[in-house]
Regions:
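Glycine-rich, proline-tolerant flexible connector loops at the mouths of alpha/beta enzymes
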Residues: 24-32, 60-66, 86-105, 188
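An N-cap/entry alpha-helix motif that binds or orients negatively charged groups
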Residues: 2-67
Length: 188
């Protein structure tokens, strides 16, 4: 299954990233930043009856490279001008060709909230999201058990990050509810 391959690759990537920048350093950097307890990502989704989270994505496992020339900043600016409530930015490099620089540069350019879209399996990635300028993170039920979902959601809350909890079926929607998710995304 592709999700299993992505999670395994993510474990390797996170271990390598921890060798470059220690978990203690990333945590300290995240904790040194102000926490916006107003949760701007959630507030943005409440602005109107219909709100859009628009995605900046270079590739996917099913489609391959979507855009060889990838003007991610221009795309993000166009989304903002078009009225997007928030922008989802892929940071997973192996299967989606994402990059932390996409998130960092978009977050520092647009005025709307930005979600780190990745396969979050380690607290380290949540601290990274905060440091990189995200307003929210994606937590995928299929990758995590309920205790871990709760732990990660609470950590994100403490940093002022919203959690969009993704479910693929009815059982995962129940998992999202059980973990106290305030935002649930259904992907099937």
């Amino acid at each position: 299954m592709i999700l299993d391959k992505i999670v395994e690759a993510t474990k390797i990537r996170v271990a390598q990233e921890k060798q470059v920048e220690s978990p203690e350093a990333v945590k300290a950097a995240a904790l040194a930043l102000p926490s916006d307890t107003g949760f701007p990502f959630e507030a943005a989704l409440r602005q109107q009856d219909f709100n859009f989270i628009c995605e900046v994505k270079k590739a996917s496992p099913s489609k391959g490279i979507i855009a060889e020339h990838f003007p991610y900043l221009d795309i993000a600016k166009e989304y903002e001008v078009a009225g997007a409530a928030a922008i989802s930015v892929l940071t997973e490099p192996d299967f989606f060709k994402g990059d932390k620089k996409y998130l960092q540069e978009i977050a520092s350019t647009v005025k709307i909230p930005v979600l780190r879209k990745d396969f979050i399996i380690d607290e380290y990635q949540i601290y990274q999201a905060k440091v990189w300028g995200a307003s929210a993170i994606l937590l995928i039920c299929a990758c995590l058990d309920v205790p871990t979902l709760i732990k990660f959601r609470k950590l994100a809350d403490s940093l002022g990050l919203s959690s969009l909890v993704e479910a693929h079926d009815e059982a995962e929607v129940q998992m999202a509810i059980d973990c106290g998710a305030r935002i649930i995304g259904v992907n099937n």
